[in-house]
Amino acid sequence: LADHRDISQFETTGDDDFSFAIVGVSRFRVSTYKQRGSYSAVIRIITFTLPQPSELMIPDAVMELANTNKGMVLVTGPAGGGKSTTLACLIDKINTEQEAHIITLEDPLEYLHTHKKSIVSQREICTDTENYLTALRASLRQSPDVILLGEMRDYETINTAMTAAETGHLIFST
């Protein structure tokens, strides 16, 4: 399934995340892991088309956060609770309504955005760049207006994201 990924990461760490598509069917997000000496996976369906915020019952007040021009917006909740889809809806709103350079940093890429009014650069961790911190630091040299950071789990990434937000960028993350 993940022919574009290096299996050595999975063999070394016992975990990996990736996405793949079956043309005409759907995209899928996969989390693989070892347990009890065997291989396991959790697979989630990601539709090719992004649902409308109203279909997902995302409040208008949340969608208005897309009109912010700097700072940090965190979307929190349990696994499978719609964080990534909510963030994708916010990115799509910016892409549809504003001229901006949007950079998404995700592991794996979930929703694929096409350019509308904005230019959307999508980088997948472990495929296009080494890790979140490296990608975030590099993105700050790529003239972004908006950065979607798929997750923040370590001090350096959080600190760099906060500095980016304080210096005039709009950061979305979980």
PLM features per residue range, with description:
Residues 1-78, 86:
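N-terminal "pre-motor" subdomain/linker immediately upstream of P-loop NTPase catalytic cores
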Residues 30, 90, 135, 160-161:
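Aromatic/hydrophobic pocket-lining residues that form π-stacking "cages" and hydrophobic walls in ligand
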Residues 57, 130-131, 153-156:
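Conserved phosphotransfer active-site motifs of two-component signaling proteins
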Residues 63, 67, 73, 86-143:
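P-loop NTPase switch/communication element
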Residues 76, 125-128, 150-151, 173-174:
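Glycine- and other small-residue-rich loops at beta-strand/loop junctions that grip anionic moieties
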Residues 79-80, 168:
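Walker A/P-loop
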Residues 83:
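Conserved lysine of the Walker
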Residues 108, 140-174:
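Conserved P-loop NTPase nucleotide-binding/switch module
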